[in-house]
């Protein structure tokens, strides 16, 4: 047994040294410096060293002996300090070991690979000590970043995996969905930089089920000493739930880094396909180690992963994804075989051998090696392949869940976050701008982009076509369009957010008076100024919550501009009666089209188009419907107007209207469930009704409906609309009715628990409310305020809203007779004064528009 253990230790040390040498060989000078010095910087704590902070910070790595590079560094620090450093304390030190893991040292490592470092510490560190050690590691991350090296430290309690404790979704160590699988990756890829050897490697695969008992027997026999080994525990049997959760996590990661994640995603799929007889890859590597079979180019973790996935895909006869995973592997290795190398290293030799086995041509290698110059056609093809592969993995995962009757043990919140991000990234929806370049190519910019409009009645579908060519007949005819959409805004947004359209792109447009180059360039400038391309990824909290509009652009009259008919005409209008939604004598709506462009809290980009006289109302209802009542207001709301005439007035009016409606939508509460907003469009008045759960639009045909709508939001009574000859009004009301004005009559009820109200419009049509409950004073104030602010809400030339304030009366009993007296309200006198002031400030002359 002793000789067997010693042989294993020698193999372990040899493979570890091979991995250290390979890691350093693939690094530039800055990476080599950081990688070599991290152990000594965690072992020592000194003001002259990076990572220093005041306090009793845990430091010191068990069994650590500095190598030559580290000794030279210590000598340099002592020379600068002027005195020798204090020797390390004896006994068990706080840090049990420092290990790199992941792609470092494997064939998958390239010169830009980041470093994932596990700092394993003693279980006896208290919370404050762990926090101090975390702060030290954070300072070391900043020190490395100052040299252009990305390092991520992970503090690992030596008992962490025994207690099934995992991190949260916000961290790189995933979430509750991973536990054993995280340990699997560590065991198969760890490189010991300092500290204790990993005990798990010493336990034969056949003893894995009895891991703890076997370890105790080794200690009891004296062949191993407990304080010389890091023991994170055995790889117990994985549950179906854990496979499910971990696979979802890999899909989550694949969205932002597809080539990197495809291989791991398929490894997990292979695990689940073999379930319940799965053998983790780390176990397979350990089996080779114990047998003395140093296969797969020195038990390289990435090569072993490719081999395992290859066997699985061949077994299920999936040649499509096999070809994809080989391309992903090739690109991950970063060795361009079609080009002459400066030197030949082991990675190039291995990759050449694999490519020869795959039968790849030189042309295929040249295409892959030119990835940095891929443009939209090639990138979209690659994106679609990656998407198909991800979705196939997802479908297989769902089948796995059904087959095993899963009750997913992963945190419901984690699962919700994962599925939300998959939905946001992958689901194709009308109006959604699909982002096709998740780290596939660094630059998709085009020198020329041409937008061509095809009207209805032609051979091609009506709408807009996008070409990455200058608009010559030969170029257009001989090329397929990059993208098609019925609406220009969607195409421009797609080109911009996917990086094709930049400040250096030459824009061309061909359309029959819908849009010209000037207007198109204005749109591009507006979008680029208000929508940054790079944003932080949505937080798990945002993904777990309902999506909310964050940045909203309202694009007015891009494709249809009613003001173009004013060209070379004299248009008479009065500023006092100027309403861009019911303009002039014809009460024409000057908004012909509205496009919405918005980005939500899940970082989705969406577009919508509305045209015709009702575009304003439809757009408003849609915007407000996407804002749940408890949502945060958008961070920005911008109106881009491209009208030929009255551009500023139209933009300002829409900005005011949208801002007011958003405020009404987000401020409606259970205590005040109904709010009302009237908008006059093309001579018709419409009401927007703001309820807690929705916003509805209703046409208001006459004054009774209008004022009834207002009062219905303030009074809780039964409303009945009738004609005058269908009801017997109180004689005093009938005799008081006056055409041409709106009249409100309040009448007390016999039980004195409420009141009735009669509303007469200009034509003396009646609406009656019985047994109303509420404040008459509040009703009078709100109705009068709606009317007095009519310049903001209506055209002054409304067919039924005239410039006389509505009249309010109280039906009373005086001297035994029923009489009508004016309703006394301080509100009315103040509103009358405000109106008089408004009138005085308005220009009275007519204006002409040329």
UniProtKB/Swiss-Prot annotation:
Coiled coil: none annotated. Its main location: cytoplasm. Keywords: ATP-binding, cAMP biosynthesis, Cytoplasm, Lyase, Nucleotide-binding. InterPro entries: Adenylate_cyclase_1 (IPR000274), Adenylate_cyclase_1_CS (IPR024686), Adenylate_cyclase_1_N (IPR024685). Residues 541-850 are annotated as: Regulatory. Belongs to the adenylyl cyclase class-1 family. This is Adenylate cyclase. It comes from Yersinia pestis.
């Amino acid at each position: 047994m002793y000789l067997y253990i010693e042989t294993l230790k020698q193999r372990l040390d040899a493979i570890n040294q091979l991995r250290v040498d390979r890691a350093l060989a693939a690094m530039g000078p800055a990476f080599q410096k950081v990688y070599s010095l991290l152990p000594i910087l965690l072992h020592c704590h000194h003001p002259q060293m990076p990572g220093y902070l005041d306090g009793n910070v845990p430091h010191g790595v068990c069994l650590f002996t500095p190598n030559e590079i580290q000794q030279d560094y210590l000598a340099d620090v002592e020379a600068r300090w002027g005195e020798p450093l204090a020797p390390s304390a004896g006994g068990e030190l706080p840090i049990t070991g420092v290990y790199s893991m992941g792609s470092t040292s494997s064939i998958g490592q390239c010169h830009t690979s980041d470093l994932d470092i596990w700092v394993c510490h003693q279980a006896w560190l208290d919370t404050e000590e762990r926090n101090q050690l975390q702060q030290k590691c954070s300072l070391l991350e900043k020190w490395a970043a100052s040299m252009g090296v990305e390092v991520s430290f992970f503090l690992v309690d030596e008992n962490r995996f025994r207690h099934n404790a995992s991190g949260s979704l916000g961290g790189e160590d995933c979430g509750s969905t991973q536990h054993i699988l995280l340990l699997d990756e560590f065991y198969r890829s760890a490189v010991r930089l300092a500290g204790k050897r990993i005990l798990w490697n010493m336990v034969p695969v056949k003893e894995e089920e009895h891991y703890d008992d076997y370890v105790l027997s080794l200690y009891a026999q004296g062949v191993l000493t407990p304080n010389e080994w890091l023991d994170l525990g055995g790889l117990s049997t994985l549950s179906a739930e854990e496979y499910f959760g971990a696979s979802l996590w890999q899909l989550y990661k694949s969205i932002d880094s597809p080539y990197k994640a495809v291989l791991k995603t398929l490894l997990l799929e292979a695990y689940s396909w073999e379930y319940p007889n799965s053998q983790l890859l780390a176990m397979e590597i350990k089996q080779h180690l114990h047998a003395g079979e140093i296969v797969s180019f020195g038990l390289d973790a990435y090569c072993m992963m490719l081999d395992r996935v290859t066997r699985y895909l061949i077994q299920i006869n999936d040649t499509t994804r096999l070809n994809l995973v080989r391309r992903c592997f090739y690109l991950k290795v970063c060795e361009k075989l079609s080009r002459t190398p400066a030197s030949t290293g082991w990675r190039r030799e291995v990759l050449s051998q694999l490519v020869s086995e795959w039968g790849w041509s030189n042309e295929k290698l040249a295409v892959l090696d030119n990835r940095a110059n891929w443009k939209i056609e090639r990138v979209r093809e690659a994106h679609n392949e990656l998407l198909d592969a991800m979705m196939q993995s997802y479908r297989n995962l769902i089948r796995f869940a059904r087959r095993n009757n899963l009750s997913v043990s992963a945190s419901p919140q984690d699962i919700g976050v994962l599925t939300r991000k998959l939905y946001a990234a992958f689901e194709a929806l009308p109006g959604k701008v699909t982002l096709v370049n998740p780290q596939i190519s660094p630059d998709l910019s085009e020198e020329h982009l041409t937008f061509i409009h095809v009207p209805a009645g032609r051979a091609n579908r009506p709408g807009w076509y996008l070409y990455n060519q200058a608009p010559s007949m030969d170029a257009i005819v001989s090329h397929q369009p990059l993208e098609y959409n019925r609406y220009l805004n969607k195409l421009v947004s797609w080109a911009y957010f996917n990086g094709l359209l930049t400040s250096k792109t030459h824009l061309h447009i061909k359309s029959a008076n819908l849009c010209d180059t000037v207007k198109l360039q204005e749109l591009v400038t507006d979008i680029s100024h208000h929508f940054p391309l790079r944003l932080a990824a949505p937080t798990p909290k945002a993904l777990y919550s309902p999506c909310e509009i964050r940045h909203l652009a309202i694009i007015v009259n891009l494709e249809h501009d009613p003001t173009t008919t004013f060209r070379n005409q004299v248009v008479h209008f009065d500023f006092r009666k100027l309403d861009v939604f019911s303009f002039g004598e014809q009460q024409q709506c000057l908004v012909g089209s509205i496009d919405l462009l918005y980005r939500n809290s899940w970082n989705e980009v969406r577009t919508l188009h509305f045209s015709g006289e009702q575009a304003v109302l439809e757009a408003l209802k849609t915007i407000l419907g996407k804002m749940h009542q408890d949502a945060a207001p958008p961070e920005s709301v911008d109106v881009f107007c491209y009208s030929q005439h009255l551009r500023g007035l139209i933009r300002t009016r829409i900005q005011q209207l949208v801002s007011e409606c958003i405020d009404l939508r987000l401020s409606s509460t259970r205590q005040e469930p109904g709010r009302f907003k009237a908008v006059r469009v093309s001579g018709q008045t419409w009401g927007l009704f703001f309820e807690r759960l929705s916003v509805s639009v209703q046409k208001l045909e006459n004054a009774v409906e209008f004022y009834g709508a207002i009062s219905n939001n303030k009074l809780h009574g039964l409303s009945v609309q009738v004609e005058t000859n269908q009801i017997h009004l109180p004689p005093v009301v009938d005799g008081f009715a006056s055409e041409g004005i709106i009249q409100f009559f309040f009448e007390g009820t016999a039980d004195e628990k409420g009141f009735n109200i009669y509303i007469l419009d200009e034509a003396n049509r009646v609406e009656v409310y019985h047994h109303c409950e509420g404040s008459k004073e509040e009703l009078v104030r709100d109705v009068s305020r709606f009317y007095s602010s009519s310049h903001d809400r209506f055209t002054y030339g409304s067919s039924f809203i005239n410039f006389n304030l509505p009249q309010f009366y109280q039906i009373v009993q005086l001297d035994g007779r029923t009489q009508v007296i004016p309703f006394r309200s301080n509100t009315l006198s103040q509103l009358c004064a405000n109106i008089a002031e408004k009138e005085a400030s308005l220009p009275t002359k007519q204006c002409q528009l040329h």
